[in-house]
Amino acid sequence: MNKTIEKTREFFSRPFFSNPKTLFWLWIGLGLISALTKFHKCNNFLIFKYVFWHTWNGTPLYEAYPAEYFDVNHYGPLFSLVIAPFAVLPHPLGLIFWHVILALLLYLSIRKLPMEQGKQILILWFCAHELLTALFMSQFNIAIAAIIVASYYFIERERESTAAFFIVLGTFVKLYG
């Protein structure tokens, strides 16, 4: 048993596993893979995308639109600004960029945490599976987690106004109708 633990420890102590670049590309890859496998099953992204178009067209945000998606929207009008760059792109590109940007936002917020790199690496490896699960559902919760971590970062840096901006942004974007 001890030999197995030692071999496992030795395997994972290789530089590849502790290199932030490895994790950066892994997280970008998770964004790409999740988007490429979900082109036809991305109901959450469709809801998000149509928040922008319904806001743009002045149509009600919280009514059912069964021809467009299979649920109802719960996001506030401010969310239409967040999703706009992805909504105006052709569907496959919008979905790919949405997933990659979500992964990138959380990766960068974790990398900014005021802790030693080894602990950041551990968090990134630990969260990779949860990231993939959330990406498969195109969930906005990834961005909310990044906003929370970024708010903490700015509070620690004594940039309370910037932290408050992120807290308000997260609240108004995720505001349920």
Question: What do the PLM-derived regions correspond to, one by one?
Answer:
Residues 94-95, 122, 145, 160-164:
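Alpha-helical transmembrane segments and their helix-entry boundary regions
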Residues 150-162:
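Membrane-interface transmembrane helices that cradle and orient dolichyl/undecaprenyl
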Residues 140-149:
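Hydrophobic core segments of transmembrane alpha-helices in multi-pass, intramembrane catalytic enzymes
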Residues 100, 126-127, 150, 165-169:
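Residue-level signature of the transmembrane alpha-helical core
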Residues 161-177:
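Membrane-interface alpha helices of multi-pass inner-membrane proteins
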Residues 8-110, 114, 130-133:
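TM-lumen/periplasm interface segments of multi-pass membrane proteins
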Residues 118-135, 145:
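Transmembrane and membrane-interface helices of multi-pass
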